[in-house]
C-alpha cells in the first residue's frame, strides 16, 4: 500500500509529499490550496496560462507549469489530483496508473480530509437533469430546520472549501457530475460513502466523453456505492431503481422511492394534489404525512412536472436526516428556481415565452416539453453525440415548429417535425431565432428555448445563451 492510500485524515502526515494537479479552475485551485496547507509540494499543470490563478498559486507557494496532458507521462510525484474534465480512460492517466502513481480527484481528496473541523454526513446527489435544483432544495430545507449546510461540489463551491470552513457544518449536500463520479474509487480509503444518496433521473448525455450510454450509466450508479443510510431513487425512472438494486451498500440501508404518483409504503409521492411522505413516519403502513400542495408550489413557480419530481427527491433526502416537515414546507414557500430553467420571460398577445437554456440534453428537453400543449421550439447547439430524433417522434403533436440554432445542424435531416426553420450562423443567432419564432407563433402557443445541447458553439455559456434569449424577447415586446 502506498503512503498516500493510508492518508485518511486532515491530521495524517501529508508533510513532504509531492503532488501534481492536472488542470486548473475553482476545484483545482482548492486542491492546490488545501495541499499546500497540509505541507505538500504542489505543481499545477494546465495547457493555458491563467493570469488570475498564476498570482494565486504563487501566493500560496505552488508552482504553475503550462503543459498539455500528453506531456506529463513521466511526471515524478507521489500522487496526482485530476480535474473532472479529464477522463480516467485517458491514455496518459492509464500510463500514470501503470507507474503505480495514486490518482485522486478533488472529491476523493475532500473525503480523505473531511475531518479538519468536524465530520458530518454527506448527502450525495446526481442525475442527468435537476441535480442542481434538487441540491439547492435539499440545502434550503435543512437550513430552514436550523442546520448549518454546505451545498457544494459540481454546483460551484468546491467541497474542499467547505471542508476547510472554520465554522464547520452539520451536513454536506454534494452535487456530483458523471465526470466527478467516474473518478471516484469503489474501494479503499478514498471511496466516498454518502449517508443518503440520490440519482434524480437518468438518460443519455455526455456520450462524446464517456464513449457509450452504458459507461455513462455506470458512472452515475457510483453515487449509491457505499451508502450508509438511504438510497433515494425515482419511481418514474426504472434505471435508477436498477442502480439501487445493484449497489453495494452498508447493512440495513433503506431504499426510498419518489414519484409523481400515489406513494406506497417507503415512498414519497402525491395524493390528490398533496405531496406526502409514506417513508419516514412510524405509522407509514396506514397513513401519510402531508408536506405541501401542488397549489402552493404553483405560487412559487415550482409546479411543472419535472420540478415537482426534483422537489419530491429533495423531500425524501431532507426527511432521511429527520428534517421537520414544517421546515420543509416553509423552505418550499421561499424557494426561488435558478435562472434559465423553465423561466417564463414574457406573455404577450396570448403567446408565452419560456427560457429553458439550461436544458443541455434531450432528457431535459423532454421534461420541459411535457408541461406544454403547443410549442414553437428553439433548439440546437453542441449535441454531444446523442441522438435527438426521439424528442420529435415523441412530441410530434406538441411541437408546432422548430427553429434550429447552432453551427452544426446536421441532425435536422433525422428529425420529424411539421415545420423546420434553420437559422444560419451569425453574430446574433438568438435574435434571429426569436424573430422567426414570433412569425410562427399564434395565441395559445408557447415559444420555448430548450436547446438540447451545450452552448459553446455560439455562446459563452448556457447563461449567456439564456440572457440573449431574454434580451431578444424583451426587445421584441417593446417593438409591438
Swiss-Prot record:
Entry keywords, A to Z: ATP-binding, Cell cycle, Cell division, Cell shape, Cell wall biogenesis/degradation, Cytoplasm, Ligase, Nucleotide-binding, Peptidoglycan synthesis
GO CC aspect terms: cytoplasm
EC number of this enzyme: 6.3.2.9
GO biological processes: cell division; cell wall organization; peptidoglycan biosynthetic process; regulation of cell shape
InterPro entries, per the entry: Folylpolyglutamate_synth_CS (IPR018109), Mur-like_cat_sf (IPR036565), Mur_ligase_C (IPR004101), Mur_ligase_C_dom_sf (IPR036615), Mur_ligase_cen (IPR013221), MurD (IPR005762)
Residue ranges the record marks as coiled coil: none
Gene3D superfamilies xref list: Mur ligase, C-terminal domain, Mur-like, catalytic domain, NAD(P)-binding Rossmann-like Domain
Location within or outside the cell: Cytoplasm
One GO MF term: tetrahydrofolylpolyglutamate synthase activity
Annotated ATP binding sites: 127-133
SUPFAM superfamilies according to UniProt: MurCD N-terminal domain, MurD-like peptide ligases, catalytic domain, MurD-like peptide ligases, peptide-binding domain
Family according to the record: Belongs to the MurCDEF family.
Function description: Cell wall formation. Catalyzes the addition of glutamate to the nucleotide precursor UDP-N-acetylmuramoyl-L-alanine (UMA).
Protein name: UDP-N-acetylmuramoylalanine--D-glutamate ligase
Organism taxonomic ancestry: Bacteria, Bacillati, Actinomycetota, Actinomycetes, Micrococcales
Gene that this sequence comes from: murD
Amino acid at each position: 500500500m502506498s503512503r498516500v492510500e493510508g492518508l485518511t485524515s486532515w491530521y495524517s502526515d501529508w508533510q513532504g509529499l509531492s503532488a501534481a494537479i492536472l488542470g486548473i479552475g475553482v476545484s483545482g485551485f482548492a486542491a492546490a490550496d488545501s495541499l499546500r496547507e497540509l505541507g505538500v509540494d504542489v505543481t499545477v499543470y494546465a495547457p493555458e496560462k491563467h493570469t488570475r490563478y498564476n498570482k494565486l498559486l504563487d501566493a500560496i507557494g505552488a508552482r504553475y507549469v503550462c503543459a498539455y496532458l500528453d506531456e506529463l507521462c513521466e511526471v515524478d510525484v507521489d500522487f496526482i489530483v485530476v480535474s473532472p474534465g479529464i477522463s480516467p480512460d485517458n491514455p496518459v492517466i492509464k500510463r500514470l496508473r501503470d507507474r503505480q502513481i495514486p490518482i485522486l480527484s478533488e472529491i476523493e481528496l475532500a473525503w480523505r480530509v473531511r475531518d479538519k473541523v468536524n465530520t458530518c454526513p454527506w448527502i450525495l446527489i446526481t442525475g442527468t437533469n435537476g441535480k442542481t435544483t434538487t441540491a439547492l432544495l435539499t440545502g434550503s430545507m435543512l437550513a430552514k430546520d436550523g442546520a448549518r449546510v454546505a451545498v457544494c461540489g459540481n454546483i460551484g463551491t468546491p467541497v474542499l472549501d467547505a471542508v476547510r470552513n472554520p465554522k464547520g457544518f452539520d451536513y454536506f449536500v454534494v452535487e456530483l457530475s458523471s465526470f466527478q463520479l467516474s473518478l471516484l474509487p469503489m474501494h479503499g480509503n478514498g471511496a466516498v460513502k454518502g449517508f443518503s444518496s440520490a440519482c434524480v433521473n437518468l438518460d443519455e448525455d455526455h456520450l462524446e466523453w464517456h464513449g457509450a450510454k452504458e459507461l455513462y450509466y455506470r458512472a452515475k450508479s457510483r453515487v449509491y456505492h457505499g451508502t450508509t443510510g438511504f438510497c433515494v431513487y425515482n419511481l418514474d425512472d426504472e434505471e435508477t431503481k436498477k442502480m439501487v438494486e445493484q449497489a453495494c451498500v452498508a447493512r440495513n440501508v433503506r431504499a426510498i422511492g419518489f414519484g409523481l404518483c400515489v406513494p406506497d409504503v417507503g415512498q414519497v409521492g402525491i395524493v390528490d394534489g398533496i405531496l406526502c411522505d409514506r417513508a419516514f413516519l412510524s405509522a407509514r403502513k396506514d397513513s401519510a404525512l402531508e408536506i405541501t400542495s401542488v397549489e402552493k408550489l404553483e405560487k412559487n413557480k415550482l409546479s411543472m412536472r419535472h420540478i415537482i419530481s426534483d422537489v419530491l427527491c429533495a423531500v425524501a433526502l431532507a426527511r432521511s436526516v429527520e428534517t421537520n416537515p414544517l421546515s420543509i414546507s416553509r423552505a418550499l414557500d421561499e424557494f426561488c428556481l435558478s435562472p434559465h430553467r423553465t423561466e417564463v420571460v414574457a406573455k404577450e398577445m396570448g403567446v408565452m415565452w419560456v427560457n429553458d437554456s439550461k436544458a443541455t440534453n434531450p432528457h431535459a428537453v423532454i421534461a420541459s416539453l411535457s408541461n406544454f400543449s403547443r410549442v414553437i421550439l428553439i433548439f440546437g447547439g453542441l449535441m454531444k453525440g446523442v441522438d435527438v430524433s426521439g424528442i420529435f417522434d415523441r412530441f410530434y403533436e406538441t411541437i408546432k415548429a422548430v427553429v434550429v440554432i447552432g453551427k452544426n445542424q446536421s441532425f435536422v435531416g433525422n428529425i420529424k417535425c411539421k415545420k423546420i426553420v434553420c437559422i444560419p450562423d451569425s453574430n446574433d443567432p438568438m435574435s434571429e431565432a426569436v424573430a422567426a419564432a414570433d412569425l410562427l407563433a399564434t395565441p395559445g402557443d408557447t415559444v420555448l428555448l430548450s436547446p438540447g445541447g451545450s452552448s459553446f458553439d455560439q455562446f459563452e455559456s448556457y447563461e449567456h445563451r439564456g440572457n440573449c434569449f431574454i434580451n431578444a424577447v424583451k426587445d421584441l415586446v417593446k417593438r409591438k
